[in-house]
């Protein structure tokens, strides 16, 4: 592994330098330009942290829809300076790359290959750079998710559950990983009975499902559930004691019932916009979860043996079919991309084409969105059409990734360089 350390340090150094440069540039843009570089939520985080230092509820700050833990973590913004939070998120960004590197090495990737995947898909990727340097907290969730999945594959169930519980507390979406993690833990290193060689489960409709449910409830699954549940319950009880119902309402319930009628990448946004005052609005919002639920169940059963790949598909599907979809949500699945890249066997031309389509889909959406946001033109239909096209592009990319993905055993082979 020694041969990979200099390369990893160089990649981390380059990633750090790029992110710090963007943080400093953000100070300039915020001072002289109309459109601020810093994420609007970062001001919300800082205001909530200031309220916490005064012994008040962070939910006194309008639009603070997060766990109070985030406000607590950013209290140095008040005492040391407002750059602290951005530097914390940048550190989380780099830590996520470090965890991804270790996961790749465990899965059998050479030091050079692991370093290259982390650099290309994360460290030198402009999207994660921009998200963390603008003051968005997604990197903290990313490092916890990566650590949880890596520790599950490494057999450290207790520590994996600890990271998973913290991740779910920060953001609800990792809760969707519960089923594939449980299925992955059921075998404890042995293949599940009735599963195909490619990891696809084969079972009868009733008897097979029941047998699988019984098998899933083994020692590792119960330990994982107990630890993760205890972490989540302890934090929930603590913050409920401190801040009462408004904590549950803003940190959890708001996100479950959220119906954002502002323009975003979601294919549902225009429908929710038009039906905002309808008596069927709430029911339509709930119905939007059904395609997600069905697809997530299918992916869980089909690909649980390769946990990182399964969770990558999970997250990409969840984001693409969600009622609300913004650019920062892409980080949720991009952080898993470095780990699955070595198993995607496609030509570089096809890969470049898929990357071009992904960026082109965003560009086609951003053009009418800009005209609406800054020029006041009524471009809702064009934005919705671009969102539908982007959903088709994302679906096509996922189909291509699945069809060109070659699964390998999750027990990493012995690497020569230790």
From Swiss-Prot:
UniProtKB keywords: Endoplasmic reticulum, Glycosyltransferase, GPI-anchor biosynthesis, Membrane, Transferase, Transmembrane, Transmembrane helix
Spans traversing the lipid bilayer: 7-27, 80-100, 137-157, 221-241, 282-302, 324-344, 352-372, 379-399
Membrane topology, record value: Multi-pass membrane protein
Lumenal side stretches: 28-79, 158-220, 303-323, 373-378
Pathway(s) per entry: Glycolipid biosynthesis; glycosylphosphatidylinositol-anchor biosynthesis
EC number(s) on file: 2.4.1.-
Main localization, broad class: endoplasmic reticulum
Positions on the Cytoplasmic side per record topology: 1-6, 101-136, 242-281, 345-351, 400-418
UniProt cross-references to PANTHER family, sorted A to Z: GPI MANNOSYLTRANSFERASE 1 (PTHR12886:SF0), PIG-M MANNOSYLTRANSFERASE (PTHR12886)
Database matches in InterPro entries: PIG-M
Coiled-coil region(s): none
Subunit architecture: Part of the glycosylphosphatidylinositol-mannosyltransferase I complex that is composed of PIGM and PIGX.
Name of one Pfam family that matches: Mannosyl_trans
Organism: Gallus gallus
Keyword match rRNA processing: no
Endoplasmic reticulum listed as a keyword: yes
Enzyme type, top EC level: transferase
GO molecular function: glycolipid 1,4-alpha-mannosyltransferase activity; mannosyltransferase activity
GO cellular component terms, A-Z: endoplasmic reticulum membrane; glycosylphosphatidylinositol-mannosyltransferase I complex
Protein name (record): GPI alpha-1,4-mannosyltransferase I, catalytic subunit
Localization per record: Endoplasmic reticulum membrane
């Amino acid at each position: 592994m020694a041969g990979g350390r200099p390369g990893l340090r160089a990649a981390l150094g380059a990633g750090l330098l790029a992110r710090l440069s963007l943080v400093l540039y953000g100070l300039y843009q915020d001072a002289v330009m109309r459109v601020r570089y810093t994420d609007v939520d970062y001001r919300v985080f800082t205001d909530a942290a200031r309220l916490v230092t005064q012994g008040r509820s962070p939910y006194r700050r309008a639009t603070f829809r997060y766990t109070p833990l985030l406000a607590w973590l950013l209290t140095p913004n008040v005492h040391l300076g407002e750059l602290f939070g951005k530097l914390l998120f940048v550190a989380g960004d780099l830590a996520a790359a470090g965890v991804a590197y270790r996961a790749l090495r465990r899965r059998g990737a050479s030091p050079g290959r692991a370093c290259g995947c982390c650099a290309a898909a994360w460290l030198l990727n402009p999207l994660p750079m921009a998200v963390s340097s603008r003051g968005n907290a997604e990197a903290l969730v990313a490092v916890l998710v990566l650590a949880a999945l890596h520790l599950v594959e490494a057999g450290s169930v207790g520590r994996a559950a600890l990271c998973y519980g913290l991740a779910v507390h920060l953001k609800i979406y990792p809760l969707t990983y519960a089923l594939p993690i449980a299925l992955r833990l059921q075998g404890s290193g042995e293949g599940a009975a009735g599963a195909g060689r490619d990891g696809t489960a084969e079972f009868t409709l009733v008897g097979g499902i029941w047998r699988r449910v019984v098998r899933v409830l083994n020692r590792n699954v119960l330990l994982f559930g107990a630890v993760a549940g205890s972490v989540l319950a302890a934090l929930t009880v603590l913050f409920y004691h401190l801040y009462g119902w408004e904590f549950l309402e803003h940190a959890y319930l708001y996100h479950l019932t959220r119906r954002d009628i502002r323009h975003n990448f979601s294919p549902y946004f225009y429908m929710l916009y038009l039906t905002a005052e309808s008596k069927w609005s709430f029911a339509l919002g709930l119905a939007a979860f059904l395609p997600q639920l069905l697809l997530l169940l299918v992916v869980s059963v089909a690909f649980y043996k390769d946990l990182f790949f399964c969770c990558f598909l999970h997250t990409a599907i969840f984001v693409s079919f969600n009622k609300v979809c913004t650019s920062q949500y892409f980080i949720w699945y991009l952080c898993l991309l470095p780990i699955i890249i070595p198993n995607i066997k496609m030509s570089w031309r096809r890969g470049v084409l898929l990357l071009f389509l992904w960026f082109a889909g965003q560009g086609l959406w951003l053009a009418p969105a800009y005209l609406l946001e800054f020029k006041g033109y009524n471009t809702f239909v064009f934005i919705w059409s671009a969102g539908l096209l982007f959903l088709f592009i994302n679906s096509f990319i996922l189909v291509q990734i699945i069809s060109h993905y070659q699964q390998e055993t999750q027990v990493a082979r012995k690497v020569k360089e230790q």
